[in-house]
């Protein structure tokens, strides 16, 4: 397996890195574009014709009638290669860290340990070397030539003093690192924080402990939402008794048998939808 594996010298695992590896480039009147027509052969023998507009920065999309080109790491040679195979030959954590920056895959959190007792984290995959990621369109005149280069100077952690590393399938990094490598989105940190808390509950771990950690479904993150919903429903106990009963017996877990968990999760989702729906509607109008 590639996502998790071992060569008996090191063991590794990957989770999504959520780094910013794309910029929208605002094209100007002098920007050269051209159309490419492609034919996609389908399994049933039919052919789907597809046309797209390209530029020197990447494929072009019109937003509010203005052309923007998507400059994306996946379109760069450094982001697609077979360097990942070198991980199989690594004998130590240091070997794996040395390989990480050269590997051409979508950016992942590399977690690696070795038989000598070392452990480390580093972002593995193609990252553009441009120094200022932007959440807004970048003027074509300000396009950085560093987009053509892979970022070799990237943060890593090896053998932390507290003896613990975790990712939880989410973005990892300091506030300073985030200013350089974000914002490529993020996964909610609830899972990461719960893994962190579990790791600090013990000083020694067996394989079964890590397996139990993977199966940990305690709904810690939703506990405040559970309390809030229960408070609201208890304002009319007669009308809401069946829901109150479900919440009082929710088992505090993401269990298939927990009706209360489903109520709390959907309650949180609905509150967020109500609060942000007007903003989302306005953004959709602006995007046409």
Describe the predicted segments one by one:
Residues 237-288:
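A terminal-accessory region detector
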Residues 1-241, 245-254:
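Mature extracytoplasmic enzyme cores
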């Amino acid at each position: 397996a590639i996502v998790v594996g071992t060569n008996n010298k090191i063991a590794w695992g990957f989770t999504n890195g959520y780094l910013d590896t794309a910029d929208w480039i605002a094209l100007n009147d002098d920007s050269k574009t051209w159309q490419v027509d492609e034919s996609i052969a389908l399994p049933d023998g039919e052919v789907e014709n597809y046309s797209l507009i390209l530029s020197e920065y990447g494929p072009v999309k019109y937003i509010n009638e203005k052309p923007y080109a998507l400059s994306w790491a996946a379109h760069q040679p450094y982001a697609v290669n077979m360097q990942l195979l070198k991980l199989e030959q690594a004998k130590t954590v240091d070997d794996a860290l040395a390989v990480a920056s050269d590997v051409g895959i979508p950016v992942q959190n590399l977690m690696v340990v070795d038989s000598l007792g070392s452990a480390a984290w580093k972002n593995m995959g193609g990252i553009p070397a441009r120094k200022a990621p932007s959440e807004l369109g970048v003027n074509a005149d300000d396009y950085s030539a560093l987009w053509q280069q892979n970022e070799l100077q990237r943060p890593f952690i090896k053998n932390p003093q507290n003896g613990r590393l975790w990712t939880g399938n989410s973005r990892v990094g300091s506030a300073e690192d985030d200013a350089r490598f974000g914002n490529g989105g993020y996964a909610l940190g609830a899972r990461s924080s719960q893994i962190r808390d579990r790791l600090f509950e013990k000083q020694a771990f067996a394989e079964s402990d890590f397996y139990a950690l993977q199966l940990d479904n305690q709904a810690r993150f939703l506990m405040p939402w559970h309390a809030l919903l229960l408070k609201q429903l208890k304002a009319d106990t007669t009308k809401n008794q069946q829901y109150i009963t479900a919440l009082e017996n929710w088992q505090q877990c993401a269990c298939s048998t927990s009706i209360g968990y489903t109520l709390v999760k959907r309650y949180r989702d609905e509150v967020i939808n109500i609060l942000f729906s007007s903003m989302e509607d306005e953004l959709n109008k602006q995007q046409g």
